[in-house]
From Swiss-Prot:
Carbamoyl phosphate binds at residues 61-64, 88, 112, 139-142, 268-269, 296. This is Ornithine carbamoyltransferase. Reversibly catalyzes the transfer of the carbamoyl group from carbamoyl phosphate (CP) to the N(epsilon) atom of ornithine (ORN) to produce L-citrulline. One of its GO terms (molecular function) is amino acid binding. It comes from the Bacteria. The gene is argF. Pathway: Amino-acid biosynthesis; L-arginine biosynthesis; L-arginine from L-ornithine and carbamoyl phosphate: step 1/3.
């Protein structure tokens, strides 16, 4: 095991989007471009050949697991996968003790769990960088991938408008952090009773956040339209109630037509065609969903590289 960075700098974590400065986000996105270009040219990029990633899953995953595991292997490292079923986490070991032990044996940890406070408790007792692979409150790796995908297809996101249609979940709160940091406007439209929590969002700067009761209005002129499932993990008991409440929040061709002519559509997946988005949209010409999914791999490689090696010359 090696020190957190080649510069022996302070220990850094990525638990929410605002843990990095705008300049650091820009650096990671630029490194993503370079790393992806190497990947497409089959050029090896193995700066983490002696590093080990521990992945801790307390929530099920497909894209998060595959992208982190493949990414670490592609950079020359190794991976240990832990779940509540095969570790002491499932037997009531305090997460602080788990952090103290795991972080003495690996170089970096990714956790996908429930409450944000849980990953914060882990990080506060870890000797190595910790990455949020998803919590109930935030999903920063996904938003990094989404922003990179927008830049890749349409250029800088500063000054643009992102329309979030659907549940005010971890994605929407992370989009808001990104908007505040990177200078774009976030339109949010949710059904009554599912709005952003005023206590959590505080008072965003003027022009950062606009909330709409009508999803069509939220899409008006948007450069990026995005959504997520109506029922997130942990809320399955509300599924039928949510289907009724969200019926008018299905992103369809009419909503995309209201957006900017060059607008793109994104979805963090898994998607339920006919619920939060129509098949026509997610499988249509404006959809960049599959590039978005692939880009989780590349941004997370850049993220791990940055947390372990610092900024490279």
């Amino acid at each position: 095991m090696t020190p957190p960075t080649t510069q022996n700098g302070p220990l850094r974590h990525f638990l929410q989007f605002k843990d990095f400065s705008p300049a650091e986000i820009a650096y990671v996105l630029e490194r993503t471009r370079i790393i992806k270009d190497k990947f497409k040219r089959y050029e090896p990029h193995m700066p983490l050949h002696d590093r080990t990633l521990a992945m801790v899953f307390e929530k099920a995953s497909t894209r998060t697991r595959v992208s982190f595991e493949a990414g670490m292997y592609q950079m020359g490292g190794s991976v240990i996968n832990l779940t509540s079923n095969d570790s002491q986490l499932g037997r009531s070991e305090p997460i602080e003790d788990t952090a103290r032990v795991i972080s003495r044996m690996v170089d970096i940890v990714m956790i996908r769990t429930f409450e944000q406070t849980r990953i914060e408790r882990f990080a506060s007792h870890s000797r190595v960088p910790v990455i949020n692979g998803l919590t109930n409150e935030y999903h920063p790796c996904q938003i990094l991938a989404d922003i990179f995908t927008y830049i890749e297809h349409r250029g800088p996101i500063a000054g643009k408008t992102v329309a979030w249609i659907g549940d005010a979940n971890n994605m929407s709160y992370t989009w808001l952090q990104a908007a505040e940091m990177l200078g774009f406007t976030l339109h949010v439209s949710t059904p009554a009773g599912y709005e952003l929590d005023p206590a959590r969002i505080g008072a965003p700067a003027a022009g950062v956040l606009k909330q709409f009761k009508d999803p069509m209005q939220a899409c008006q002129g948007a450069h990026l339209v995005t959504t997520d499932v109506w029922t997130s993990m942990g809320y399955e008991a509300e599924n039928e109630e949510r289907r009724a409440a969200f019926a008018d929040w299905c992103v369809d061709a009419e909503m995309m037509a209201a957006a900017d002519p060059q607008a793109v559509f994104m979805h963090c997946l898994p998607a339920h065609r006919g619920e939060e988005v129509t098949g026509e949209v997610i499988d249509g010409a404006q959809s960049v969903v599959w590039d978005e999914a692939e880009n989780r791999l590349h941004v997370q490689k850049a993220l791990m590289e940055f947390l372990l090696l610092g900024q490279l010359a």
